[in-house]
């Protein structure tokens, strides 16, 4: 039987990334740029979300060679993505020794009915969520870290803003509920009752919740921190920009000093062009990655 890590240990690893930026990278060179810029971790994958979106087809776990090259190149934690419900991809990444697995809607889901039972793994997991129902279901399955789904690969922050605001509003609503109301809310959200009780008692989610999906500028990163994010994932925004090293450093600084508007103004000067963005309303239903999972 596989050894499993305790929730406290897994969640503690996520807490250590709090306030930081996690960057998508596709090779060792990009990983080094991210580390030098101050990233707290990197996400190793074959293609950034913008390229996955452009290429279409089936997106799978990265070649293990890429993951190992990134792991050997940097001293910061390395994450990697597995398809939703793909037990073997997750086990392979665990065997490779990654620090975290992202059960990710950016990749093509392997199972449209079941997410991974993350409690059975030693390695901790991060999962996306759009609302408190999705957040608590992922936590109940064993996720040690959450992130907004946003709309990956678009360079458009609007969906990440929507998801962060919704989760936070629903947490505030739960905190003000009686136990009787909590049971009904658990039914309405499809959320485990005991988890809602814990959220009511603590006044917050039991795991960290990062912003992800559409972060393209230092101002975007600062905005998400102001809305209550515990940190920021940047997928396509850095290495699809004109000056990745400068963009990476600027986003890290803006995430740390998210209320220092003069600094953010300076960081935003002469960065070059940000990644080309996509208007969400122009996406076809099958192109909306955030709809994947349940």
Swiss-Prot record:
GO molecular function, one term: pyridoxal 5'-phosphate synthase (glutamine hydrolysing) activity
Involved pathway(s): Cofactor biosynthesis; pyridoxal 5'-phosphate biosynthesis
Keyword terms, alphabetized: Lyase, Pyridoxal phosphate, Schiff base
Active-site residues per Swiss-Prot or TrEMBL entry: 81 (schiff-base intermediate with d-ribose 5-phosphate)
Pfam family, any one: SOR_SNZ
Annotated residues for binding of D-glyceraldehyde 3-phosphate: 165
Source organism superkingdom: Bacteria
Its EC number(s): 4.3.3.6
Amino-acid positions noted as binding D-ribose 5-phosphate in the UniProt annotation, renumbered to this chain: 24, 153, 214, 235-236
GO BP, sorted A to Z: amino acid metabolic process; pyridoxal phosphate biosynthetic process; pyridoxine biosynthetic process
Enzyme class per UniProt: lyase
Record field: catalytic activity: aldehydo-D-ribose 5-phosphate + D-glyceraldehyde 3-phosphate + L-glutamine = pyridoxal 5'-phosphate + L-glutamate + phosphate + 3 H2O + H(+)
UniProt-listed NCBIfam families: PRK04180.1, pyridoxal 5'-phosphate synthase lyase subunit PdxS
Quaternary structure and partners: In the presence of PdxT, forms a dodecamer of heterodimers.
HAMAP family from the UniProt entry: PdxS
Role, per record: Catalyzes the formation of pyridoxal 5'-phosphate from ribose 5-phosphate (RBP), glyceraldehyde 3-phosphate (G3P) and ammonia. The ammonia is provided by the PdxT subunit. Can also use ribulose 5-phosphate and dihydroxyacetone phosphate as substrates, resulting from enzyme-catalyzed isomerization of RBP and G3P, respectively.
Family: Belongs to the PdxS/SNZ family.
Entry protein name: Pyridoxal 5'-phosphate synthase subunit PdxS
Species classification: Bacteria, Bacillati, Bacillota, Bacilli, Bacillales
Gene this chain is encoded by: pdxS
